[in-house]
Amino acid sequence: MKLLFSFLTALFLFFQSDLDALRNSYEKANSSTANTQIFINIAEKQTGSDAVTSAYKAAAKIMEAKIVTKNRKALVKSGATSLESIIKNNPNNVELRVIRMSVQENIPKIVGYSKNLKEDKMFIIDNYSRQNPALKTYIRKFAAQSKTMNAAEKNSLR
């Protein structure tokens, strides 16, 4: 059954662009360990070095800490450091803020990587109208399940 699921996922993702594949697998990554592993595999196979692809790779490194038993702290630290560096070099990229906000919402609070939630939320809301239609749809999907955005903020993303 897992083999069939993996095959269908691979087939589906083959016909998508690399960025679409990353986005789609990232959306589902927190729903199960299998989906987390699929996202990590897709991220690792990416050859692009653009900021968005690199940010998804950093998020994959952080998420890998959820499913491994060794080096968890090192994975989180390395991924978070990479993600922060990417955002520092691309401060006006909304998708990078969505990625960081998502990571910070889903990482255990004890890790201490949640200081940018309010900042990223406001940045996303303030810059939403200037994004392309595909990214707007992605942001709305993220906002719908966000723990940081309230109902009014979610409704403002229309």
Where are these regions (language model features)?
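Helix-turn-helix repeat elements of alpha-solenoid scaffolds
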Residues: 27-41, 72-80, 113-114
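Short coil/turn linking the two alpha-helices of tandem helical-hairpin repeats
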Residues: 27-30, 58, 63-70, 106-111, ...
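Terminal, low-structured helical/coil segments at or just beyond the last alpha-helical repeat
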Residues: 123-158
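Bacterial Sec-dependent N-terminal signal peptides
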Residues: 1-21
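Structural register within alpha-helical repeat arrays
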Residues: 57, 62-64, 100, 138-139, ...
